[in-house]
From Swiss-Prot:
Assembly factor required for Rieske Fe-S protein RIP1 incorporation into the cytochrome b-c1 (CIII) complex. Functions as a chaperone, binding to this subunit within the mitochondrial matrix and stabilizing it prior to its translocation and insertion into the late CIII dimeric intermediate within the mitochondrial inner membrane. Modulates the mitochondrial matrix zinc pool. InterPro entries: Complex1_LYR_LYRM7, MZM1/LYRM7. GO terms for molecular function: protein folding chaperone. Its main location: mitochondrion. One of its GO terms (cellular component) is mitochondrial matrix. Interacts with RIP1. This is Mitochondrial zinc maintenance protein 1, mitochondrial. The lineage of its organism: Eukaryota, Fungi, Dikarya, Ascomycota, Saccharomycotina. It comes from the Eukaryota. The gene is MZM1.
Length: 127
């Protein structure tokens, strides 16, 4: 397969992934499409064509698996403790983790004497 065919395929994957990720949000969908189009028309000169294609495929994969949009449900809808209610756009391709990495991070923080990431105190994670 030629480089131009692979690039076109990656671009199409990106557009499909954006359509899934931003379903119902025309503003974000149009912004994502514009950004992808700009990247195809004026590619980063520091990257090879193969790297650019790989980057577009990675972006498409990230949009499909890791991006979940939330939409606030009516202003008057709240939980019993007064918090707002949101509806999440979780679809068949959304990657649902098991939170083991979050649990491991808390253990690591304790092992480091409570020092948070980036040298912070970790106070935000204690709440």
């Amino acid at each position: 397969m030629s480089t131009s065919q692979r690039a076109l395929g990656a671009y199409r994957h990106g557009l499909r992934a954006a359509r899934i990720a931003f379903q119902g949000d025309t503003t974000m969908l149009n912004a994502a499409r514009l950004k992808m189009r700009q990247g195809m028309e004026k590619p980063n000169p520091e990257l090879s064509k193969d790297q650019q294609i790989s980057l577009m495929e990675d972006v498409a994969l990230f949009l499909r698996r890791n991006l979940v949009q939330g939409k606030k449900i009516k202003e008057s809808t709240t939980t019993s403790d007064g918090k707002d209610v949101y509806r999440l756009n979780i679809h068949k391709d959304t990657e649902l983790g098991d939170n083991d990495t979050v649990k491991n991070a808390k253990t690591t923080l304790k092992a480091n004497g409570g020092v948070g990431c980036c040298g912070g105190s970790g106070a935000a994670s204690k709440s």
